[in-house]
Amino acid sequence: MVCGGFACSKNALCALNVVYMLVSLLLIGVAAWGKGLGLVSSIHIIGGVIAVGVFLLLIAVAGLVGAVNHHQVLLFFYMIILGLVFIFQFVISCSCLAINRSKQADVINASWWVMSNKTRDELERSFDCCGLFNLTTLYQQDYDFCTAICKSQSPTCQMCGEKFLKYSDEALKILGGVGLFFSFTEILGVWLAMRFRNLKDPRANPSAFL
């Protein structure tokens, strides 16, 4: 049977949703693993990652059930939701690739001062740095309370802002690239669902509508 047929479209849509399910379970597992090992203490970060994983899992399950049963309503809502996710993810991915170091520094600086003291302390110890940028009157206060190892090994510690900028630049490029890749898989999912939804099941009653 040619790949444009009913069976091939069904199998392709099922395979795509199985991949989405694996990715969602991976997100949930990594978040739980990070929390269990104490790598990330912020419940907001953990909750956000798990929420994204659960949302993706629900979409994948809906798409898989719709594909297996050729369910018109499920496939319709699957297309709509996946299309909206594509638009949102495409915009975010392009923003990640377009943001410059100056904007990154502004975001890091704004985020730093809304963090709790515990979170800042954990970041300083994890990255072995003290303070953010030596541009504010609070930098010296941060430096005085810093518990990073570098403080006891050398007269001065590298500023956390410099390290954050280095890692954030790399992370944004990776996130933007991966996000764009998944954006195009979502467009593929919308196209497959639309095509499959309009195909007639060869096993169905010939007189039935679709």
From Swiss-Prot:
Membrane topology: Multi-pass membrane protein
Positions of transmembrane segments: 13-33, 45-65, 73-93, 174-194
Cystine residue pairs: none
Domain of life: Eukaryota
Pfam families recorded: Tetraspanin (PF00335)
Chain positions carrying an annotated carbohydrate: 100, 109, 117, 134
Keyword Glycoprotein carried by entry: yes
GO cellular component: membrane
Topological domains, Cytoplasmic: 1-12, 66-72, 195-210
Residue ranges that the UniProt entry lists as topological domain Extracellular: 34-44, 94-173
Subcellular location: Membrane
Keywords, comma-separated and alphabetical: Glycoprotein, Membrane, Transmembrane, Transmembrane helix
Similarity comment text for this entry: Belongs to the tetraspanin (TM4SF) family.
PANTHER family: TETRASPANIN (PTHR19282), TETRASPANIN-31 (PTHR19282:SF3)
Protein name: Tetraspanin-31
Organism: Pongo abelii (Sumatran orangutan)
